[in-house]
């Protein structure tokens, strides 16, 4: 048997074992739901304060958690830019949202063409936003990735820079309340153990061993590395904003086991049908994002919340050891910024 065939056989065996291993946590999840349910605690969207006059951007706002994040922000008076790549899907989502919620003014939900895989197009969106608005109060980096794709940039980097540049007075206004929310997941704990974000290659191909790229393990590792990057990015953003005395609060979060296409795609094929029955609905999954973006207690006690990782509305959790690696966070920021600056994108903001 040739070495190539031996390698392929080993990959298939390990991948099958990995896929089978996922049944155990799903079984535990089922038992937990049977006994305790999937409640998110005492906080829900009814506690969102009035947001009249505020401007928000929600990436990936046309479906899943993002859709319900847009819905509840707009219903409380915010003007929400629904960031999405597909015009037809975005407008269909807006049409559905307005039909289901006739009290939301039509002008409160606006499509923002936003393809996070295209840096130039993301900057176009940021420039468009700056031309239309004098402020940006809330950015929810919610858009996920397809686990079959490689990571190209830290999710939402350019839009996060737009928050900073669209709010030049944020550092001087003590009463301002600007928040950047980055949606991660508990999958951040299952990233590649060797990835330290020391080179652009660590973003492009987190599963460096040849042959594993499209395996179940490779897809899960790619997903986990993306989610790890989300947490590191949010923490590093907060550190930098604090250094500049900018009144910007950065949070990352785990929305929970939510019934979305992204969650299903990470699972082995034979497990995916169980997602529908075991995972919670996207509307409930949006609660943590909404708490992070709007809860008044975060503004009132900002030092307690700055840079934190939430595991439910109002629940601060210590993320994995790797997600607390400040050096990796700085490395991630630096290689991402270098990659974006190399395109000339930031010069346009």
UniProtKB/Swiss-Prot annotation:
Enzyme class: oxidoreductase
Glycosylation site list: 118, 334
Source organism superkingdom: Eukaryota
Positions contributing to NADP(+) binding: 65, 89, 115, 142, 164, 223, 227
UniProt keyword Oxidoreductase present: yes
Biotech exploitation of the protein: Diterpenoid pyrones display various biological activities and FDDP E shows anti-HIV activity. FDDP D and FDDP E show also inhibitory activity of 42-mer-amyloid beta aggregation that is involved in the pathogenesis of Alzheimer's disease.
Residues that span the membrane, as ranges: 9-31
Name this protein carries in UniProt: Short chain dehydrogenase/reductase dpfgH
Organism encoding this protein: Gibberella zeae (strain ATCC MYA-4620 / CBS 123657 / FGSC 9075 / NRRL 31084 / PH-1)
